[in-house]
């Protein structure tokens, strides 16, 4: 959807599905994860990323790989290396490349009258009189004669996002480690009046922790512990930004004001919806009418033991893997 915090969708073999599922099988260090989990993994923590499809996927993973397989491997430390610390901080500004231009109230009313007359073979009384058009143009009373630029009122010109990541890696003769901590802060493009009871703009915070430790019990036995923790929150309107945008596209500038003045810290909305000659709902009310806050946390931990069986047959090895995942 493009909203802050929304997950990505992955399609390897197109939208056609096998077994009613279109998304590929995603394996992180050999453990199946969701696209949402993958979306939150910092790029700095990924060692390799590969894609399997068709026969190469089904030969190994059977029907589970019918829609393709994504193999993701996270980074790990190297033996006998000093600790290496990497820090990155990013600040970005996003702005729509193209924004629509809307007619103001007087232009809309004159154009509406012309279109109304063009559809009739005889002279008709225009929907908007010259007096109403003149009053709207003068701005004498914006609550009685509204002239609302819905797009300019509801959407900001751009938004700022921030991201910070710090990771440490290294190792000794038998143990290696890699640890990463990342914080993300993303905001949306929604705006509100100064006397609004709350800020409707999407505010998304996210923290990710990755910890990979490998220890050699013997020269042929290795234990790997991997832990990925993700926590975050998102605040914003209950209605999606795409739906709010649609309401802006449908509304005209003169049917009703965005809101009526009330107390210092409160406002009263105009008509939520009009019927005769309707041009949709009040976009501002649609945005401000409900508020939502979501909190999430995910813990994904795996432990595997690898045993080299080269003393039996060259190239032979065995691996036991246990995984635990908890989310809410």
Name each region found by the language model.
Residues 53:
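Flexible N-lobe loop architecture of eukaryotic-like protein kinase catalytic domains
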Residues 26-27, 87-88, 317-326:
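Extended hydrophobic secondary-structure segments that form protein cores and membrane-embedded regions
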Residues 314:
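Glycine-rich, aromatic-lined ligand/substrate-binding cores of catalytic
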Residues 298-300:
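Short, solvent-exposed loop/turn segments enriched in Ser/Thr/Gly
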Residues 1-11, 15-25, 31, 38, ...:
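Membrane-proximal, glycine/serine-rich, low-complexity loop/turn segments characteristic
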């Amino acid at each position: 959807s493009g909203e802050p915090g929304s997950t990505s969708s992955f399609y390897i073999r197109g939208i056609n599905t096998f077994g009613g599922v279109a998304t590929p099988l995603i394996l992180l260090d050999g453990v199946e994860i969701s696209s949402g989990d993958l979306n939150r993994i910092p790029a700095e923590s990924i060692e390799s990323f590969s894609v399997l499809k068709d026969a190469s996927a089904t030969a190994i993973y059977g029907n589970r790989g019918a829609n393709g397989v994504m193999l993701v491997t996270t980074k790990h430390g190297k033996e006998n290396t000093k600790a290496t610390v990497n820090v990155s901080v990013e600040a970005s500004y996003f702005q729509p490349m193209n924004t629509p231009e809307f007619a103001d109230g007087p232009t809309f009313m004159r154009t509406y009258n012309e279109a109304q007359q063009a559809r009739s073979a005889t002279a008709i009384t225009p929907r908007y009189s010259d007096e109403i058009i003149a009053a709207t143009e003068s701005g004498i009373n914006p609550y009685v004669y509204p002239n609302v630029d819905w797009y300019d009122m509801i959407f900001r010109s751009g938004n700022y996002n921030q991201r910070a990541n710090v990771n440490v890696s290294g190792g000794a003769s038998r143990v290696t480690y890699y640890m990463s901590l990342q914080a993300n802060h993303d905001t949306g493009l929604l705006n509100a009046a100064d006397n609004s009871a709350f800020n409707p703009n999407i505010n998304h915070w996210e923290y990710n922790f990755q910890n990979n430790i490998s220890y050699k019990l013997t020269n042929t036995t290795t234990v790997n512990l991997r832990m990925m923790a993700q926590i975050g929150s998102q605040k914003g309107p209950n209605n999606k930004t795409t739906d709010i945008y649609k309401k802006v596209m449908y509304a005209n500038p003169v049917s009703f004001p965005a809101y009526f003045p009330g107390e210092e810290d409160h406002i009263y909305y105009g008509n939520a919806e009009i019927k005769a000659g309707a041009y949709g709902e009040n976009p501002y009310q649609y945005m401000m009418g409900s508020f939502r806050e979501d909190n999430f946390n995910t813990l994904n931990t795996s432990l595997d033991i690898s045993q080299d069986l080269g003393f039996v047959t060259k190239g032979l090895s065995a691996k036991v893997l246990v995984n635990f995942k908890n989310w809410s």
